[in-house]
From Swiss-Prot:
Record keywords: Ribonucleoprotein, Ribosomal protein
UniProt lineage: Bacteria, Pseudomonadati, Chlorobiota, Chlorobiia, Chlorobiales
Disulfide pairings: none
NCBIfam families assigned: rpmF_bact
HAMAP family: Ribosomal_bL32
Pfam entry (one): Ribosomal_L32p
Biological processes per GO annotation: translation
Protein name from the UniProt record: Large ribosomal subunit protein bL32
Molecular function GO labels: structural constituent of ribosome
Provenance organism: Chlorobium chlorochromatii (strain CaD3)
């Protein structure tokens, strides 16, 4: 059976695994409970600035 000839470092191993995970996992979107706009989960809403029922982003008035 084939054996590795050189030890692979942890950083090199993790870089290889990160490429696989980046391609296979899709972004999870949910609707904001405050305004109803689609947002990424576990992130503040870009449209209204709310996260977990609190106002966290200061949106400048145009």
């Amino acid at each position: 059976m084939a054996n590795p000839t050189c030890k692979m470092s942890k950083s090199r191993r993790d870089k290889r695994r990160a490429q696989f995970n980046a391609r296979t996992k899709a972004a999870v979107t949910v609707n904001c409970p405050h305004c109803g706009e689609p947002t990424l989960s576990h992130r503040a809403c870009r449209h209204c600035g709310h996260y977990r029922g609190r106002f966290v982003l200061n949106k400048a008035e145009k």
